[in-house]
């Protein structure tokens, strides 16, 4: 076995420093994002927000994803700008402590998700310029593990604080933690290659459409993720209207989901490095589909806990898979543009799905159970398309080297 040299150890120090700062920022995102995702819809529902209003709240991250097609012009171009944008997004949640109300909840949710959507293309390019490609999946898995662990702890503590101090105060405290942790990116030493070239909305879409593999995976994720997006507002109806759960119960569901995500991130990252990102998405989507079906029939909290575990395992596989597929299919120079195009294409379906299903439920056309089963049917289509995309990828690779894929 070759012993490590002084030069090899010195070469790892910049990566270790960057990884540490990345982890601090990821923890802050996990804390603030936990309460935005798990508690904010329930808080809004208890505040009187109707199903269509919940749909607006659920659509917020996808509208901002669609708008991130303009990130090439208005997104961060340095690590300091990156830190500022993430800090402002998390810090906006503090406003709930002073001006509570459903309108303010929707407004701060939009500000929070804008900060995430507009910074994610820069972040993916930053990772590509900072970390070696051979360890990309494990880096994403490591950071995801830290963020998911923070999410689990924040969901547990946040649920307890929400019951004692009130939901808006708990969310505001999480936003403060996220804003402070986002400052870690200001100390990130990135190479000049990390600064993306300016690109237009048209160029970001072109970067996606130029790669058939990305189009196939985006189509699959459109159906799979679309089913979960449509189901999002219905989850709050299950918690409040069907089962009348407390905020601490909802927080505990979030804890288990985040715990499942935490323990699975590194495993999915290793799978992505060993095979490819699509392998993680194929198997993870099957697990997530089972969790969505559980929600449709859940008679009580125990079944919801099982569903949360399944969905948590699935969400980490999708996140690792997306980063892996886009990185594998694009050179560093066009990676930020491709990520913006991905966000825009997948975000467009997020604008329609929650409103469609919430309207069907609110106007009495379907009940919550039927609505969730329709969502599961859409996600099941996405699962099938992930497997189809993998088969096409193998066929294309075989054709490129002159091998019969059926052999």
Segments (PLM) and residue ranges:
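Multi-pass alpha-helical transporter architecture, strongest
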Residues: 97, 180-192, 373-407
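Structural signature of the two symmetry-related core transmembrane helices
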Residues: 81-95, 279-294
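Juxtamembrane intracellular "pre-TM" segments in multi-pass secondary transporters
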Residues: 2-16, 192-220, 403-407
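Helix-loop boundary and gating motifs at the non-cytosolic
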Residues: 4-66, 72, 213-253
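Loop-to-transmembrane helix entry/capping segments in MFS-fold secondary transporters
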Residues: 51, 133-143, 247-248, 332-342
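Helix-to-loop junctions at the C-terminal end of transmembrane segments
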Residues: 67-80, 162, 264-276, 361
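A membrane-interface helix-boundary motif in multi-pass transporters
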Residues: 162-178, 359-379
